[in-house]
Design a protein with these regions (language model features):
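A recurrent flexible, glycine/aromatic-enriched loop bordering the glycosyltransferase active site
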Residues: 92, 110-131
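A short, glycine-/small-residue-rich helix N-cap motif at loop->alpha-helix starts
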Residues: 33-41, 64
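Active-site nucleotide-sugar/metal-binding loop of Leloir-type enzymes
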Residues: 43-53
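Acidic donor-binding segment of Leloir-type glycosyltransferases
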Residues: 1-30
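C-terminal catalytic/acceptor-binding lobe
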Residues: 124, 128-203
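Short beta-strand-to-loop acidic/aromatic patch adjacent to the donor-nucleotide binding site
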Residues: 52-62
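Conserved donor-nucleotide/metal-binding helix-loop-beta segment in metal-dependent transferases, i.e.
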Residues: 66-88
Length: 203
């Protein structure tokens, strides 16, 4: 595992992380990244990762409930249609036709997977997630320059591309190709809150 830091991060923050690695999470390699911002660090990480899957999490999230990470990896290995499993920052709510405000405006049960509750979603987001690296490198990276999106972002170009394909071809057909899931069942709990007490995830 690798932890990347933005170059602006203060020394005490880095010391806190290193203390955790030394005393609780042995075996984690800490890399002081020269990049600044989410996109260049994400891009560097996914291109240098030596495992089939990558866990991405920024420093400012509070994970509210336990996550069965080994089971997530088992499911992603078994089912080739599962490419992204993210922790929802809202409950896996009923469908809401307001995609400009809430990315998970479609949530559906996934009956093909019995080992773990996952919810099919219309969202691509970079809140904490496990991603299948081959899917990103073989397909999704080519959407990062999607017209009309912020090209300094990972999330927005991919979300806009995913949403537009859903509008053109329908959710089920497009989801079968993209394979984006929320952790937990439909109407399940939210798993995240921002540590900065921002409004993100409050709706």
């Amino acid at each position: 595992s690798i932890q990347y830091f933005k170059k602006e991060v203060n020394n005490q923050y880095i010391k806190n992380i290193l203390n955790l690695v030394d005393n609780k999470f042995q075996g984690i390699e800490v890399v002081d990244s020269p990049n600044s911002g989410l996109r260049p660090n994400y891009w560097h990480a996914i291109n240098t990762c030596s495992t089939p899957y990558m866990l991405f999490i920024e420093h400012d999230w509070d994970i509210l409930h336990p996550i069965d990470t080994p089971k997530v990896l088992e499911v992603m290995e078994k089912y080739d249609f599962v490419n992204l499993v993210k922790l929802p920052k809202r409950a896996n709510m009923i469908e809401m036709d307001i995609p400009s405000r809430i990315q998970d405006y479609i949530v559906k049960e996934e009956p093909r997977i019995k080992e773990l509750d996952l919810t099919k979603t219309s969202s691509f987001a970079t809140n904490p997630h496990i991603i299948k690296i081959s899917k990103f490198l073989n397909e999704w990276k080519y959407h990062l320059t999607y017209p009309g999106s912020d090209h300094n972002s990972i999330e927005l170009p991919l979300f806009h591309k995913y949403r537009d394909e859903i509008n053109m071809f329908g959710f089920e057909e497009v989801h079968n190709k993209w394979g984006c899931y929320n952790y937990g069942p439909p109407s399940g709990l939210k798993y995240l809150e921002h540590l900065d007490a921002s409004k993100s995830g409050k709706l």
